[in-house]
Amino acid sequence: MDTIQIKDKKFTVSIKEQDILKEVTRVANEINRDLAGKNPLFLSVLNGSFMFTADLMKNITIPCEISFVKLASYQGVSSTGVIKEVIGITEDLTDRTVVIVEDIVDTGLTMQRLLDTLGTRNPKEIHIASLLVKPDKLKVDLNIEYVAMEIPNDFIVGYGLDYDGFGRNYADIYTVVDLSLIHI
């Protein structure tokens, strides 16, 4: 499908599944190399990162654990600026190597909140793996070590990303057709 309709918006394919999977495999290989012997805890940020996490973990070959956290800062097509932790972290992170797995880093505010929260639990080190990063939109300085792709400031759906809860199920990533209609 080259074009999809979700609610009142039309989207066109911008990143094909095979290109996504190639970059996810590259990121997994980097993590395998860098974190060998550290038994990392992968902390997947739901809901958006579920596809990225699944494909990433299929390619992680080092001993590891995985858990999930749910934070929210989006409503519709733009960040609300209000970050609310919905599902907390139950694991003991003391002296652990943690890898945050995120679908997209936009402003970075949600990621900074998560880093602050994790930091109070005394991990040995925290790494960030993100499928997508919008470098021109970042408002905070973050060390995102594992980035599959950098993208422009477009509104996108698919591969776990949604528009008001819809569109997460698509294997490709789609960009809204007329961004001028949306105020991000």
Protein language model regions, located:
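PRPP-associated nucleotide enzymes
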Residues: M1-I182
